[in-house]
Amino acid sequence: MARAEVVVGAERLPEYLPLLRDSRVALLSNHTGLVNGGKEHTLDMLLRNGVNVTAIFSPEHGFRGDADAGSHVKNSVDAKTGIPIASLYNGKDSSPSPETMDRFDVILCDLQDVGVRYYTYYVTMMKLMDAAARSGKRFIVLDRPNPIAMMVDGPVLDMSLKSGVGALPVPVAHGMTLGELALMINGECWLPSATVCYTH
C-alpha cells in the first residue's frame, strides 16, 4: 500500500512565489518551519529562490527555537542571515513597531501548530494579522497539518478569561490548522482592531 506524502504549504513554491514578486517579505516562523524532509528551514529555501526577505518575526521560543517555554524573547538579528528579528513574545505589548512594519510589503506565516487553544502560536499569528490589517499588508499562511485534526474536544473559552494562552472562543482542541483559524478569525471579525486582514 502506497504511503501518502504531505506537502506542507511552504513547499508549494509555484503557488505562492508569484504573490511575492517585486515584494519585500517578512517571515513569521521558528524552528518548526522546516521543509525538504526537515533538511532545510523555510527561510533558507526562500532566500535560495530569490525571495527578498527583509524582516523576521519570532513567536514563543524564538526564531531558532533556543528560548525556554514562557521566556521573554528579545529583538535580535539572525546570526546566519543578518536579517533583523522582531520578537512578538517579549513580555510587553509585543505588537510590531511602525518602523518594523515599514520594512516589508507581505507577511509569510510558517509555523507548526498542535491544534490546542492554550498553544501560543495562533495568538501570535492573530496579533500580526491585526497589525497587517491596520497597515494594509498582505498576509499569507503557509499551512501545515494539525496533528490532532480529528479531535475537537473541551469547552469553548469564556472570553472573560481571555489571555495569551487563550484568546479565541474555540474549544480546547479546536480541530483547525493555522490557515483555517486565520480564515475563521477574519470571517468572525475577531481581530482586535475589528478590521479584516487581506489573507491568502
Q: Residue ranges of each PLM-predicted region?
A:
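Acidic, His- and aromatic-enriched active-site or binding-groove loops in soluble protein domains
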Residues: M159-G179
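Short internal beta-strands
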Residues: N52-H61, L142
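Glycine-rich, charge-decorated loop segments at or immediately adjacent to ligand/cofactor-binding or catalytic sites
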Residues: G65-A69, I140-K162
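A short helix->loop->beta-strand "cap" motif at the edges of active sites that frequently abuts
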Residues: G50-V51, A132-R138
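Conserved small/polar residues in nucleotide/adenosyl-binding loops
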Residues: T199-H200
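Glycine-rich oxoanion-binding loops at beta->alpha junctions
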Residues: V73-F104, V116
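N-terminal phosphate-binding or glycine-rich loops at protein starts, especially the Walker A/P-loop
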Residues: E5-V51
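Glycine/threonine-rich flexible loop motifs
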Residues: D113-M125
